[in-house]
Amino acid sequence: MFWIKTTLYQYLTQKYGQIQPPADLKAVGSPVDEAEYACPDPDTFPDDEPLKRYEEGNSMVGMKQDILYFLNPLAAEPCYYQVDLDSKAFMAYAKQIDGTPNTVLSAIMLKMVSRYFSIKKDQHISAKIADDYRKDIGCGKSYRDFVRFIHVKYDREMAEESIEKLSQRARGAILLQMQPENSFEWYRRVAEARKGIDEQPNLRSRISYAQKHSLYKSDARDTYTVSYVGRTDWGGMADYITGVYAITDGNLMLEVNALPDKICVTYQVFDRDSRPLDLFLQILQEEKLPYTVSERMVRYMPDLQLPKPKAKHNITQGTFEK
């Protein structure tokens, strides 16, 4: 995000003149502080056990869609919708029920899923919520990818509860799993996986090792995902931005960004069926939350091929070896 801001700031100032920069703007040519690429040493972490672990197992609700897509991606047409929520109204609603954007959207998605899928009595629905844990491990200024997922389990019968009650359930699960001990444990696993990748002799074997030992591959399977890691400071650039939408790869996945006047939701699905979106909007209407929504848009993901490195890259330390 740092360099997206820099590029956008360059473009806007060249076009419109001087604009108040965000506090964390990285100017072209400015020195890179060591803290910006910091990587922690897991051996320095305390060995305390977390109070809460997620051991509830996978959610089978919606898995058929995911499996069919990954078996034959060409048979589907991944798409997304831009849903804009009025920031003032949404945050007032969240405050009134003692919720957060993550917990409120998780509760709304639960109700949507319960109306969309035929859920068996013994099945449960679970939410995956992104957690930026860089501060827990002492790397608050680092722009490395320090994100893990928190899981919130709901029983089928809970879908009849109010958004307020469901939001409280989600918040309780989030608070327990956001303990620093969970972050220490997760990063130890990350460091171990990276060490294994670095030990491989060539790029092909590194890719193979990474695929077989992916931490997310062994993580719990959830019904839907909500990814909101906080409001971004755009400075004076916010006056020129009409929306911020992150496009990723996932089904029933909400990527959420915030501007001063609106919360921008990228509502992503694997196919052209509009019912998941329609039900989501229906619940917004029931809760009297104002919104606007775009037409369906095809989700094109970049197909990148990395160049062959001239030196061996150590991903654990972020360095190249001769």
Task: Explain the meaning of each model-derived region.
Residues 1-32, 91-93, 185-189, 239, ...:
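Acyl-group handoff/entry surfaces in thioester-processing enzymes
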Residues 2, 49, 84, 88, ...:
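Generic alpha-helical secondary structure signal
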Residues 2-89, 284-322:
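Non-catalytic, low-complexity flexible loops and terminal extensions
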Residues 3-12, 101-113, 170, 276-288:
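Structural preference for long, well-ordered alpha-helical segments in enzyme cores
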Residues 35-47, 92-108, 208-224:
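Short, charge-rich amphipathic segments
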Residues 66-134, 226, 263:
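Gly/Ser/Thr-rich phosphate-binding loops and adjoining beta-strand/alpha-helix segments
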Residues 115-322:
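Acyl-thioester-dependent acyl-group transfer interface
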